[in-house]
Amino acid sequence: MIKAIEGVVTKKEPAFAVLKTNSGVSYGIFISLFCSAKLSKGEKVELAITQIIREDANLLYGFLDANEQKMFEMLIKLNGIGASTAMAVCSSLSSQAFTNAIISGDADTFKSVPGIGPKTARRIIAELSDTKLISDESVPSYQNEALLALEALGFKREKIVKILPDCKSENTSDLIKEALKKLG
């Protein structure tokens, strides 16, 4: 099983790249639009790989971001979601937007992705709402602590997730106070 490939980008399209390794082997890898925007032809990169082996193909999906890879892998495990639909989600939503949409039950966010209709959007939310979602390491721990404290006070997670990004405080107690004012 291939877990990562390091090489030079020899070809780049919006959703596909070719990496040539030091050994001279070139790999065709499907990538998201976010990943494509960060790659440059001639650049040496390492992509984390999710390999999908089918009867008729051996497909490689590459990621610069671990959260994007986790999001992709969560989606392809769902019934009726294939790799191309999962990659469309990765190309349309950041990992934070993905997590927020599931937590808040926002089907419209998923319906905005090409190839996802209302039933599929609801199914994604229903099937992933109980799973441990992506933890964004860029989210400071004080925000997570504030989220847990506000939930303990009885506020709904969906409402908390919507207002926390607007709060400017940078420590747990001040963030809780600011959030309480916004939550009413």
From Swiss-Prot:
Alphabetical list of SUPFAM superfamilies matching this protein: DNA helicase RuvA subunit, C-terminal domain, Nucleic acid-binding proteins, RuvA domain 2-like
GO CC annotations, alphabetized: cytoplasm; Holliday junction helicase complex; Holliday junction resolvase complex
Main location: cytoplasm
One Pfam family in the UniProt entry: RuvA_N
Biological process according to GO: DNA recombination; DNA repair
UniProt-annotated stretches for the region Domain II: 65-134
Region spans: Flexible linker: 134-137
Region annotation (Domain I) ranges: 1-64
GO molecular function, one term: ATP binding
Domain of life of the organism encoding this protein: Bacteria
Localization annotation: Cytoplasm
Keywords: Cytoplasm, DNA damage, DNA recombination, DNA repair, DNA-binding
Location of the region described as Domain III in the Swiss-Prot/TrEMBL record: 138-184
Assembly description: Homotetramer. Forms an RuvA(8)-RuvB(12)-Holliday junction (HJ) complex. HJ DNA is sandwiched between 2 RuvA tetramers; dsDNA enters through RuvA and exits via RuvB. An RuvB hexamer assembles on each DNA strand where it exits the tetramer. Each RuvB hexamer is contacted by two RuvA subunits (via domain III) on 2 adjacent RuvB subunits; this complex drives branch migration. In the full resolvosome a probable DNA-RuvA(4)-RuvB(12)-RuvC(2) complex forms which resolves the HJ.
Summary of the function given for this chain in its UniProt record: The RuvA-RuvB-RuvC complex processes Holliday junction (HJ) DNA during genetic recombination and DNA repair, while the RuvA-RuvB complex plays an important role in the rescue of blocked DNA replication forks via replication fork reversal (RFR). RuvA specifically binds to HJ cruciform DNA, conferring on it an open structure. The RuvB hexamer acts as an ATP-dependent pump, pulling dsDNA into and through the RuvAB complex. HJ branch migration allows RuvC to scan DNA until it finds its consensus sequence, where it cleaves and resolves the cruciform DNA.
Domain topic, free-text comment: Has three domains with a flexible linker between the domains II and III and assumes an 'L' shape. Domain III is highly mobile and contacts RuvB.
Family to which the UniProt record says this protein belongs: Belongs to the RuvA family.
Name under which the protein is recorded: Holliday junction branch migration complex subunit RuvA
Species: Campylobacter concisus (strain 13826)
Lineage, uppermost ranks: Bacteria, Pseudomonadati, Campylobacterota, Epsilonproteobacteria, Campylobacterales
